[in-house]
């Protein structure tokens, strides 16, 4: 009978037999939560130091625990640590190895602690550290866009709505649109860090502990602003993981929109940009091909990240307080999303910096599709005092005439324009060039080159403080 007893010495006391092989397989998380080894050891070191300072464990026990944990950290980092599925997770793998190294003193480490608050602090530490990495990556991407925006503040290109030519803008203005998007992403990252900057360590299983622990001490040691204020919520909460996935999904959406534009712009039909060899691949059969695979893969990774968010939302949606084993399924979603977001941001920063901009193609396209029609309507309002709706109607007739003649608006004769509205003068022709159009958009946040440069100056100052 003793041979049948559970082999897990961490919780096996009340069990008469060990788990079925299938139970062992479905219960084990060491295949993925080993990624938390550094955070688990970090949390245990802080917990042990606090136990010693408060007199809960002896100084000698603390010394042995600390030395043992540092040895384990080195073993893992050197690839010499053997992970066991029978021990389920990273917490018990480390604790079992600690017992091998230092003996009975290892059993004192878990005093006033549960795996519930242990995994909560490990995971929160990991997400917090990952958010800091995401912030740094986003800053790098924003800086890449600022460089290109400054370089092309006056480079004219078509602006689109419905992917149809709308009005001329500058490429610098287009770049600054992405600075705004990724700037909001960076702001969300900073907000998330601020919200999650509390330590759940010391909440124990769910109700706190009767030992005289110092949760403020461990929170400070682990780099948190303060401890969490409710032990039940502390072990139940995965909002920080959901928030990470949410902001990752929003950011991935921005990356995907950018990737789509790069894919379109790099086609021979558009010919706005040329991708560097460093971020392209070729075809195994068609020698002429230069494929935007990096951009396409960034676009595709959005699906994975969105899927991770939906998965964790679904996992958490009906769980009663406090901890349920369902929550073991939280980590793979976050790990996968973090890895793919980091890679996608880095790839996009590289692509943006390496893009060759075809200024001539952009300018030519900017003048097509009657892109200065709005400028004609605005002129009619300013110079002739027409209500905008009437000016819109007059301009629409001018566009229809130009289409029938198969010419641009600026190529219509004064007589043809006056046949639509007799008040039009030859002064209008100075307003129908793409350069004049973009220069006229001087409103705050507009596409005029001087306004683009002003926004660049603002963001350069802001990003240094982000």
From Swiss-Prot:
It holds the Pfam family Lyase_1. GO terms for cellular component: cytosol. Gene3D superfamilies: Fumarase/aspartase (C-terminal domain), Fumarase/aspartase (Central domain), Fumarase/aspartase (N-terminal domain). GO terms for molecular function: argininosuccinate lyase activity. CDD domains: Argininosuccinate_lyase. Pathway: Amino-acid biosynthesis; L-arginine biosynthesis; L-arginine from L-ornithine and carbamoyl phosphate: step 3/3. Its EC number is 4.3.2.1. The keyword Oxidoreductase does not apply. Keywords: Amino-acid biosynthesis, Arginine biosynthesis, Cytoplasm, Lyase. NCBIfam families: argH. HAMAP family: Arg_succ_lyase. This is Argininosuccinate lyase.
């Amino acid at each position: 009978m003793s041979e049948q007893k559970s082999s897990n010495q961490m919780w096996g006391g009340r069990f008469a037999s060990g788990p079925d092989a299938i139970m062992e397989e479905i219960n084990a998380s060491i295949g993925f939560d080993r990624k938390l080894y550094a955070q688990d050891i970090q949390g245990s070191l802080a917990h042990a130091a606090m136990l010693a300072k408060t007199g809960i464990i002896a100084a000698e026990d603390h010394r042995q625990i600390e030395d043992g944990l540092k040895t384990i950290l080195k073993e893992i980092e050197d690839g010499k640590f053997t992970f066991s599925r029978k021990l389920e997770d990273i917490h018990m793998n480390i604790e079992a190895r600690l017992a091998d190294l230092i003996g009975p003193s290892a059993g004192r480490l878990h005093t006033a602690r549960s795996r519930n608050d242990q995994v909560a602090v490990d995971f929160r530490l990991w997400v917090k550290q990952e958010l800091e990495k995401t912030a740094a990556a986003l800053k790098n991407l924003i800086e890449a866009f600022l460089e290109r925006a400054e370089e092309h503040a006056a480079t004219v290109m078509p602006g689109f709505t419905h992917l149809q030519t709308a009005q001329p803008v500058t490429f610098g203005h287009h770049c600054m649109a992405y600075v705004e998007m990724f700037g909001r992403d960076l702001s969300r990252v900073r907000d998330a860090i601020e919200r999650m900057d509390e330590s759940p360590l010391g909440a124990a299983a769910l109700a706190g502990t009767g030992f005289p622990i110092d949760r403020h001490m461990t929170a400070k040691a682990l780099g948190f602003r303060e401890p969490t204020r409710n032990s039940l919520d502390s072990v139940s909460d995965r909002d920080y993981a959901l928030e990470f996935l949410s902001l990752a999904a929003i950011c991935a959406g921005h990356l995907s929109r950018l990737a789509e534009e790069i894919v379109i712009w790099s086609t021979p039909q558009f010919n706005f940009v040329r991708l560097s060899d460093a971020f392209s691949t070729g075809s195994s059969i068609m020698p002429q091909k230069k494929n935007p695979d990096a951009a396409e893969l960034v676009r595709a990774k959005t699906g994975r990240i969105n899927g991770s968010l939906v998965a964790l939302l679904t996992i958490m949606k009906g769980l009663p307080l406090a901890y349920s084993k369902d929550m073991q399924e939280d980590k793979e979603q976050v790990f996968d999303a973090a890895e793919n977001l980091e890679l996608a941001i880095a790839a996009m920063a590289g692509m943006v910096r390496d893009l060759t901009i075809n200024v001539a193609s952009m300018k030519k396209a900017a003048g097509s599709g009657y892109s200065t029609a709005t400028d004609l309507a605005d002129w009619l309002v300013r110079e002739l005092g027409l209500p905008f709706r009437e000016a819109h109607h007059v301009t629409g007739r001018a566009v229809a005439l130009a289409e029938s003649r198969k010419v641009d608006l600026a190529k219509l004769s004064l007589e043809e324009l006056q046949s639509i509205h007799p008040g039009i003068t030859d002064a209008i022709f100075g307003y129908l060039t793409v350069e004049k159009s973009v220069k006229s958009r001087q409103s705050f946040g507009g596409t005029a080159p001087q306004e683009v440069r002003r926004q660049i100056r603002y963001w350069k100052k802001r990003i240094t403080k982000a």
